[in-house]
């Protein structure tokens, strides 16, 4: 039951008690009036006695007249005595008296105490909510700082990985270029050995080596590689630009692999042609030697 309903019920009870007390007061007043009326009733009896004395004083002549006239009906009403019981209001014992002011005061104090309790509970809940909100903000800030630190460490690791990949790529390219240079040198040496045009080609190769032509070619290759190999500057790029840069690098790697495959196939074809030419040269040399011996033997015969 709510406080409003309790207050309404108490108010109705107070009204009923007031009505009851008013009814008791009315009954007491009526009882007092009836008692006063009962004390005033003997006066008609005295009047009746005087009337009887007057009747007795009347002479016998009048009685004779009355006897001659015969009985006459008495039309006057006889006075009737009313019996009114004495109504005494019930008395309330002293121990059962109800003090409505005290009840009202206690009710007001109870309401005030409940209101004070509700206010204190409200402020306690509000204080708890504020503390929880502050702790939640602290946790959010702490988590945000941890994420920023993790992101910074991740970026540093990614940067180091990119640097290692770039260094590894540069090292592989340098080794590949060195290997290609050695292969070309071996091919040139093989070609020079296959060509038996006297010592002209060998001398020319020696003079070229002495003149530093190989060093010049190496420098040219280094220059070309330096032009092709560009610095990887990705610190200022965002996520979309990094994706574009990755696609561009992947495309360049794809092109290099395709070019490498073409060069390998070309190298295989050249190697095959060199072997064919070497076999032909060997066959021709064998044929020329046998012919020379046959001519010499025939001439001596």
Swiss-Prot record:
Modified residues (Phosphothreonine): 207, 216, 297
Domain of life, source organism: Eukaryota
Molecular function GO labels: actin binding; structural constituent of cytoskeleton; tropomyosin binding; troponin C binding; troponin I binding
Modifications the protein undergoes after translation, according to the UniProt entry: Phosphorylation at Thr-216 by PRKCA induces significant reduction in myofilament calcium sensitivity and actomyosin ATPase activity.
Phosphoprotein recorded as keyword: yes
Phosphoserine: residues bearing it: 2, 211
Residue(s) carrying N-acetylserine: 2
A GO-annotated cellular component: sarcomere
SUPFAM superfamilies cross-referenced by the UniProt entry: Troponin coil-coiled subunits
Protein function: Troponin T is the tropomyosin-binding subunit of troponin, the thin filament regulatory complex which confers calcium-sensitivity to striated muscle actomyosin ATPase activity.
PANTHER family per UniProt: TROPONIN T (PTHR11521), TROPONIN T, CARDIAC MUSCLE (PTHR11521:SF5)
Protein name: Troponin T, cardiac muscle
Native source organism of the sequence: Mus musculus
């Amino acid at each position: 039951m709510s406080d409003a309903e309790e207050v309404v019920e108490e108010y109705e009870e107070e009204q009923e008690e007031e009505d009851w007390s008013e009814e008791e007061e009315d009954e007491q007043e009526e009882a007092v009036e009836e008692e006063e009326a009962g004390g005033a009733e003997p006066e008609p009896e005295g009047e009746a006695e005087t009337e009887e004395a007057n009747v007795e004083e009347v002479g016998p002549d009048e009685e004779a007249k009355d006897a001659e006239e015969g009985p006459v009906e008495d039309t006057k009403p006889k006075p009737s005595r009313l019996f009114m019981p004495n109504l005494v209001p019930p008395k309330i014992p002293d121990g059962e008296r109800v003090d409505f002011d005290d009840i009202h005061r206690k009710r007001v104090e109870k309401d005030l105490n409940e209101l004070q309790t509700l206010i204190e509970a409200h402020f306690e809940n509000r204080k708890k909510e504020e503390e929880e909100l502050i702790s939640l903000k602290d946790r959010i800030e702490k988590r945000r700082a941890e994420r920023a630190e993790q992101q910074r460490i991740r970026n540093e690791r990614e940067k180091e990985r990119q640097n290692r990949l770039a260094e590894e790529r540069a090292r592989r390219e340098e080794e590949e270029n060195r290997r290609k240079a050695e292969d070309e040198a071996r091919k040139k040496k093989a070609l020079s050995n296959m060509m038996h045009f006297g010592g002209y080609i060998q001398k020319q190769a020696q003079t070229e080596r002495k003149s530093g032509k190989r060093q010049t070619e190496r420098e040219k290759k280094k220059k070309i590689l330096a032009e092709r190999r560009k610095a990887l500057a990705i610190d200022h790029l965002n996520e979309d630009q990094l994706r574009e840069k990755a696609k561009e690098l992947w495309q360049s790697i794809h092109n290099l692999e395709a070019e490498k495959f073409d060069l390998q196939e070309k190298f295989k074809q050249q190697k095959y042609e060199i072997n064919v030419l070497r076999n032909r040269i060997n066959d021709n040399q064998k044929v020329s030697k046998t012919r020379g011996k046959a001519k010499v033997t025939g001439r001596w015969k």
